[in-house]
Amino acid sequence: MKQTKPFFAYRSFWKEFDAKKRFASIGVDQFAVFASHSTNSLGEPYGQYDPTWLWYDTYDFTPFDQQVNDVIGLCPEAKILCLIDLNSPLWLARQLYVDSYPAVTLAAAHDRWKEETRKYVRAFVEHAEKVFGDRIICYILMCGTTDEWMDFSNGTDSPGKLRAYREWCARKGLPEPADIPGVAARDHISREHTGMKLRDPVMDHDAVQYWHFHSEFNVETILEFASLVRSLVSRPVELGVFYGYILELAHSVVHRAHLAYEKLESSPDIDFLISPGDYQDRDMGGGSGFMTPNGTVLPRPHPLWALRDGRFAP
């Protein structure tokens, strides 16, 4: 949040009443609440409350209300960091044959997915504002793999993705592509030296251009939903997102659609970014630094939240 004093909040996708009570007892009064309806990387529900998105145009926000009220019962002064689940419920993934969890860019290029997800977000935010607007201090948009806007589709094409790619090229003043580059072209490496893999801007022009689009399209989706949330809230509210993990994803960073972090950080519709600590430096004494390029983030007006979800010695 935009404040000068140190900021600390507690987040757990499970109920964890004892932990929340202990944090409240030491003065922590900001808690994350996630009204989830999607599953995690193990195929299990993210949370321990019932889902809120049940079918087309059918929502039940009672579990969300219960979750917030459970927090208030433990900490009457609680302020809420409200996480919005944009990922597909299992029934929607089966209905549309596209799942935003592994393939957020394919889902975003699917008109029906975007239509239904926008309707859910609208209904959820309107309800949240009506019932808990005086407690909610920010909204955090969650989508893609592990809800962190990562894409594991390896750039797979679809009719909607091709249409979006052509529109992106038109906005950039580039020639209209006949198709999305195939797998061999997308993954081709022209230069390799001491383990470093590089693409030649001439020889690999089509791949470089497509992967540029791949990340920008992901950010455009984030900003579209951020704008929607902003339009539904009549009071000043901050919006955040998990994005920009270029220091963690290593050789897969091009594929994961996290390269357009400067475009996201320059947008007035996003107020802060969130990043876990780096998972490659977890040994005792390690720093477990940020996944994001701090030198780029810090000069900009958007603060960076550090998500501390590492393992600690007993």
Task: Report the location of each language-model feature.
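Residues at alpha-helix termini
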Residues: 26, 172, 232, 308-310
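Polysaccharide-binding and catalytic clefts of secreted carbohydrate-active enzymes
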Residues: 94-282, 287, 296-297
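Acidic-and-aromatic substrate-binding clefts and catalytic sites of carbohydrate-active enzymes
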Residues: 7-23, 36-42, 54-64, 245-258, ...
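Short, surface-exposed connector motifs at secondary-structure boundaries
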Residues: 1-4, 50
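Extracellular/periplasmic catalytic domains that process cell-envelope and extracellular macromolecules
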Residues: 1-2, 24-25, 74, 131-135, ...
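Hydrophobic faces of well-ordered beta-strands that scaffold small-molecule active sites
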Residues: 6-11, 29-33, 80-84, 137-141, ...
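Aromatic-lined substrate-binding rim segments of carbohydrate-active enzymes
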Residues: 16-105, 115-118, 125-128, 224-232
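Active-site core of glycosidic bond-cleaving carbohydrate-active enzymes
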Residues: 272-275, 295-299, 304-314
